[in-house]
């Protein structure tokens, strides 16, 4: 029989679409309030997430595994260079430190637009930064493969986020940024963000140049799951 004080990862099912941000934000807030809670976000099945992938992510998290490190409160999955998902453990203290360090680099805490899958490190951190900083995380309607990533979806989310006073940030993969630059209005809105974080893939030099030409402020980042 398991001990009543057994600490194991609690799976947090992230629905596709904007609702996923509220679910994840609530889970992060719960972990902040309860140091014994360990959260592990996984995506619900969607057009972009197969049941096979979901099962492999759950297997990597190993929700039946007892965690002996009292500082661990978040388990994220990464495929690394092998393509096989692995569960990587984090403390909220490390996530908070990363948040402070990034905001110091960027010029202060700000409001985030969420464009990346929320169970990934980059997507998770956009919500975590907002929760830990007391700002907002505005979801794109395409989150989690709920619908295709489009300039229109970005424009809608960006206009909501930019209505909040303060600084504004978004994290994208290069393919998304390239697609947004095909829309004049999307390009105009990107230029109003204080930083456009890029990572997750090789970043073409001409993409950086084009972003800067439009007035945007690209900041190169890398996967931070490990």
Where are the language model's segments positioned?
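Structural motif
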Residues: 11-13, 39, 113, 169-171, ...
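A short helix-loop-beta submotif of the ANL/AMP-binding
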Residues: 12-44, 110-111, 120, 128-142
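Conserved pre-ATP/AMP-binding loop-to-beta segment of ANL
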Residues: 16-21, 60-77, 108-111
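Conserved AMP-binding A3 loop
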Residues: 71-100, 107
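Conserved S/T- and glycine-rich ATP-binding loop of Class I adenylate-forming
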Residues: 78-81, 112, 127, 170, ...
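AMP-binding/adenylate-forming
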Residues: 92-97, 111-179, 219
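Glycine-rich helix-loop-beta junction characteristic of Rossmann-like nucleotide cofactor-binding loops
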Residues: 103-107, 159-163, 187-189
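Gly/Ser/Thr-rich phosphate-binding loop
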Residues: 182-226
């Amino acid at each position: 029989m398991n001990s009543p004080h057994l600490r194991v990862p609690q799976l947090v099912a992230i629905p596709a679409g904007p609702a996923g941000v509220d679910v994840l934000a609530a889970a992060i807030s719960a972990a902040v309030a309860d140091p014994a809670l360990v959260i592990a976000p996984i995506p619900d099945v969607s057009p972009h997430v197969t049941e096979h992938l979901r099962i492999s992510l759950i297997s990597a998290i190993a929700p039946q595994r007892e965690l002996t490190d009292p500082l661990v409160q978040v388990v994220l999955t990464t495929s690394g260079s092998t393509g096989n998902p692995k569960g990587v453990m984090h403390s909220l203290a490390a996530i908070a430190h990363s948040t402070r360090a990034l905001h110091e680099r960027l010029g202060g805490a700000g409001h985030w637009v969420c464009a990346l899958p929320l169970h990934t490190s980059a997507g998770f951190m956009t919500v975590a930064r907002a929760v830990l900083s007391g700002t907002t995380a505005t979801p794109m309607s395409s989150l989690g493969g709920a619908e295709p990533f489009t300039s229109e979806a970005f424009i809608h989310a960006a206009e909501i986020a930019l209505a909040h006073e303060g600084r504004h940030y978004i994290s994208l993969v290069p393919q998304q940024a390239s697609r947004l630059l095909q829309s004049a209005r999307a390009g105009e809105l990107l230029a109003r963000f204080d930083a456009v974080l890029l990572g997750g893939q090789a970043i073409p030099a001409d993409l950086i140049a084009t972003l800067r030409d439009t007035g945007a402020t690209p900041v190169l980042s890398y996967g931070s799951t490990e």
